């Protein structure tokens, strides 16, 4: 099965322990991109006779890509590098969907491909659960360097974020449920693996997981009564949910006191900053509702909104897929995309039977999580969702769509697959240069070691958003800066909400005859980063008055 390479590398991506700035998920996501490109080539090479049609989502994704690239042309400060990233993710999503369709066609149904998907999720969740146990017991040294060291009492496997692990574990538990219901797994090992994964899920202390667990039980209740497995599935889901809630309470109220796990109480009961963040983003969206701020420009919208709604937490995503879409492509197009996608899912859910119901259940935790964070921004979730949607698409088509003759379709698909593979390789190569230069720049800023005299900053042709950041990190705020240097600082500060960049930009404005804009930038720091960080920035700014008297003209708050 050509899709084997895709799923093997997805599994690898979940387990890679490296997380380096500035793109901390790159080494986990890269295997997913490469696996998809390889699997596409294998699927096209192995195809005989007819090929699957293009996915139902192709037209919608084409509109979104036009929106992303149109923003580069029409919207100020939008960067082509962001559009390239959007392209590799959205095009990958559509191609993964097609791969799911083609695999189901080759296998004459979704049973065998779905079994492979379930096995991969069960394996990934189980291995991640074992890693979580090492993190919980502070025994990471035993597995170094094959495990990420936890810096809190919340475990996260090798995904570097507890809620990410929680979503993977829930998807793995759905897969285990299917394997047990179909007798592919005997009762004893199924119970053991479910217990292991459930305890690891408790250790994540994820409120998102609690919501997803309730949503899964609700989905089981909503399954049509005509489905033969409905009663058994409802009983299984109810028993598991009860066990999960009991274990969560036990960990919070009993083990939390025994082991002094203060983080447990905080993680499950502390108020979230999301509502405040959403208010900021809605205030920013109100300033540009028709066209949005451009793709991946959530930080820009937050900066606009923060001047009206001060907050404490900075973000590059809205922690809500719906709000992100509205910010990126505007309210009209965003609502249209959401309505079309929701309508398609509802129609297909009504047609779902047997394994397609389990496919929906597998994707539900990812959907719930996407309304509270941004797992959709990670290729190891987005591309897997595309493949599973391809399986759903194959089984639930009300009228089977005619396949495309291979002789006519294969050249175009080969071009698409080759172009995608080339884009993946080009972006991967450039990002590795970014990662190395980012490391060097951080050392330079901290005055650690010395950069070789012959070192040359990489020329980035695709990922220019990182090129701007690397340039900005090397600039020093001083009098006599050129307009181009100030423009670099401005672009970097608007794209990324990093405190050091914002302060450097504010200081540069004050030193170069723009006191009003410098004062505005200091107000933004106060509104975006909160009183403690602003107090440090203000003290640093005032400490330079003796050296630079022109800063006295800046009326900082």
Task: Describe the function of each predicted region.
Residues 20-22, 76-88, 150-165, 270-278, ...:
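Short aromatic-rich membrane-water interface segments that cap or initiate transmembrane helices
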Residues 161, 275-315, 322, 329-333:
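TM-adjacent membrane-interface loops and short helices in multi-pass inner/ER membrane proteins
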Residues 4-19, 32-44, 69-72, 86-99, ...:
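Alpha-helical transmembrane segments of multi-pass inner-membrane proteins
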Residues 1-74, 78-115, 119, 179-188, ...:
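Transmembrane signal-anchor hairpin modules in multi-pass inner-membrane enzymes, especially those
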Residues 203-204, 209, 224-269, 282-283, ...:
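A membrane-periplasm/extracellular boundary helix in multi-pass inner-membrane enzymes
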Residues 19-24, 131-144, 251-265, 290:
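Helix-to-loop transition at the C-terminal end of transmembrane segments
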Residues 34-36, 217, 355-409:
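Transmembrane alpha-helices of multi-pass inner-membrane enzymes
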Residues 23-28, 81-82, 159-163, 205-209, ...:
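Membrane-interface catalytic loops of GT-C/OST-like multi-pass glycosylation enzymes that act
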